[in-house]
Amino acid sequence: MSLKEKTQSLFANAFGYPATHTIQAPGRVNLIGEHTDYNDGFVLPCAIDYQTVISCAPRDDRKVRVMAADYENQLDEFSLDAPIVAHENYQWANYVRGVVKHLQLRNNSFGGVDMVISGNVPQGAGLSSSASLEVAVGTVLQQLYHLPLDGAQIALNGQEAENQFVGCNCGIMDQLISALGKKDHALLIDCRSLGTKAVSMPKGVAVVIINSNFKRTLVGSEYNTRREQCETGARFFQQPALRDVTIEEFNAVAHELDPIVAKRVRHILTENARTVEAASALEQGDLKRMGELMAESHASMRDDFEITVPQIDTLVEIVKAVIGDKGGVRMTGGGFGGCIVALIPEELVPAVQQAVAEQYEAKTGIKETFYVCKPSQGAGQC
């Protein structure tokens, strides 16, 4: 049973009438451009065919009813006419409440709604299950009530809800790619202007995501430290962000910087350049060059930004040994565990899966999770 069929069936059973719309919003993986977002730089994600699906219908009053199929059909109810506050027990409900609350601040011309939500974006794998939920809820209200909001505004609304209502600091990339993703394309995003450019993906290439299942512990504190080091670097160059520093300017004075800060700055400057070049390589179908750029990105994250762990490096090496120069592989996400992403010719996927199954657990004692994805369409009706 598809998520669409599941949510429509649950909707009819729970609310006693059929849903009028079914909306989906996808998760994402970032192909290249790591830790560049908060430095006003470039990222190159694609939406994946794992998504949050909501069957819904407008109500003729001001009540919102939400059922979470993936949380034992828990039900949340609240009114649009009362202040929207955090739910005491259901964390999932706060993503919904936050999106609705912030949407009211943007455009309050919508009424009540019934929703049943289900998703298959793996949670805790860094594939943006929360952004997918936020964008799905925003799209539901935009579609049901014909709100004059575009995908970028729905994405910004989701980011605000996560930052201010849920209380989790995040950039804009995750929501933006979920809202604006394009089938068979990646999206080059300028994190300063929020400008986007669709980049066609080569035919016959699979997007493979492998979760190391190494439990991330340092990610919060180390993330903040990296951010501070980048801000220190920008101040040294008297610029608002590292986006505004050239590699030539850096090389001329790198010896004057604190050695650790210099390494962090070098990663951001080179990663930005790699990300822009990667968009061109992908568009031209040059998988060999894309693979080189992904390898350079991984080495930079390992040696200059120091955010990989041995388990992740092991996974990358296993995959690289199979694909050679026919594709690319690197860590993706914040670091200290999580996932790797690989662009692999479809015919090599079984060999990669076999090599990882045979070697990764033997070397690390941890069993991986393997996902084969397609670059998918952003949020909309399904």
From Swiss-Prot:
Catalyzed reactions: alpha-D-galactose + ATP = alpha-D-galactose 1-phosphate + ADP + H(+)
GO molecular function: ATP binding; galactokinase activity; magnesium ion binding
GO biological process, one term: galactose catabolic process via UDP-galactose, Leloir pathway
Enzyme Commission numbers on file: 2.7.1.6
Coiled-coil region(s): none
Keywords, sorted A to Z: ATP-binding, Carbohydrate metabolism, Cytoplasm, Galactose metabolism, Kinase, Magnesium, Metal-binding, Nucleotide-binding, Transferase
Subcellular location per the Swiss-Prot or TrEMBL entry: Cytoplasm
Annotated pathway: Carbohydrate metabolism; galactose metabolism
Binding-site residues for substrate, renumbered to this chain: 34-37, 223
Catalytic residue positions: 174
PROSITE patterns linked: GALACTOKINASE, GHMP_KINASES_ATP
Primary site of residence: cytoplasm
Binding site for Mg(2+): 130, 162
Residues the record marks as site: Transition state stabilizer: 28
Keyword field contains Cytoplasm: yes
List of residues binding ATP: 124-130
GO CC annotations on file: cytoplasm; cytosol
Family: Belongs to the GHMP kinase family. GalK subfamily.
NCBIfam families: gal_kin, PRK05101.1
Cited function: Catalyzes the transfer of the gamma-phosphate of ATP to D-galactose to form alpha-D-galactose-1-phosphate (Gal-1-P). To a lesser extent, is also able to phosphorylate 2-deoxy-D-galactose and D-galactosamine. Is not able to use D-galacturonic acid, D-talose, L-altrose, and L-glucose as substrates.
Protein name per Swiss-Prot or TrEMBL: Galactokinase
Origin species: Escherichia coli (strain K12)
This protein's encoding gene: galK
